[in-house]
From Swiss-Prot:
Keywords of the record: Methyltransferase, S-adenosyl-L-methionine, Transferase, tRNA processing
Tree of life domain: Bacteria
Record EC number: 2.1.1.33
Family: Belongs to the class I-like SAM-binding methyltransferase superfamily. TrmB family.
Taxonomic source organism: Shewanella baltica (strain OS195)
Function statement: Catalyzes the formation of N(7)-methylguanine at position 46 (m7G46) in tRNA.
Name of the gene encoding the protein in the UniProt record: trmB
Pfam families tied to this protein: Methyltransf_4
Binding residues for S-adenosyl-L-methionine: 68, 93, 120, 143
Name this protein carries in UniProt: tRNA (guanine-N(7)-)-methyltransferase
């Protein structure tokens, strides 16, 4: 097993240190997930290296590239890749069954424009993604760490926003979604204060769910129960 680190920040979003947050668990794979990893990793898997990817080499073409941090089981990421064949997609996930499920779904869907990391997202972003190379970064339903004493563990902080800004092209978009209203308010505060971004919301708050983000079964059930989901989209302008 590989140990994974993640950044910790203070209340002002100042980087403090890297902490051991969890272990990159093998997880309990189904037979289908294990088979998908074995058969699909050679073509869709990306082995981490601390040198920037040459995206045109990875995908065999020049195209806008979308990166998703923490894709879970991967169903929505595969759907996005299928719906937008002219774009390239990279997903990062630490949970191995999720990686296996994503690769299985991708193979069934026949997508060729998707690549996957099984690694810590902070390391991938810092070292394996070139500055100014991404058209969109997606962070959907990150852990809200709702207890106040855990807020410093929230991924959306000032230095993280700056890291994402560096990786986006001018005109690229950081798209965040959460089902925790207080976290959406925290995210909005962080992003409004982050230099080099422009909120794509007409009223300076959140945006309606864009067509490119699929409506998940979990989210649809939440809507029926009256639960909200908040989307934020910030464009890199400098």
């Amino acid at each position: 097993m590989s140990e994974v680190t993640t950044a910790e920040f203070n209340e002002e979003g100042k980087y403090l240190r890297k902490i051991r947050s969890f272990v990159l668990r093998e997880g309990r794979l189904t037979k289908g997930q294990a088979q998908a990893i074995e058969s699909q990793w050679p073509t869709m898997g990306l082995d981490y290296s601390p040198t920037p990817l040459v995206l045109s080499d990875v995908f065999g073409r020049e195209a806008d590239t979308v990166l998703e941090i923490g894709f879970g089981m991967g169903a929505s990421l595969v759907q996005m890749a299928k719906d937008a064949p002219a774009q390239n997609f990279i997903g990062i996930e630490v949970h191995k069954p999720g990686v296996g499920s994503c690769l299985s779904d991708a193979a069934i869907a026949g997508v060729t424009n998707l690549r996957v990391y099984h690694h810590d997202a902070m390391e991938v972003l810092e070292h394996a993604i070139a500055d100014g190379s991404l058209a969109r970064v997606q962070l959907f339903f990150p852990d809200p760490w709702h207890k106040k004493r855990h807020h410093k563990r929230r991924i959306v902080q000032a230095e993280f926003a700056e890291l994402i800004r560096r990786k986006l092209k001018i005109g690229g978009v950081f798209h965040i979604a959460t089902d925790w209203e207080e976290y959406s308010e925290h995210m909005l505060e962080v992003m409004q204060a982050a230099p080099g971004y422009k909120n794509q919301s007409s009223d300076g708050t959140v945006v309606p769910r864009p067509d490119h983000r699929p409506l998940t079964k979990f989210e649809a059930r939440g809507h029926r129960l009256g639960h909200g989901v908040w989307d934020l989209m910030f464009e890199r302008i400098a």
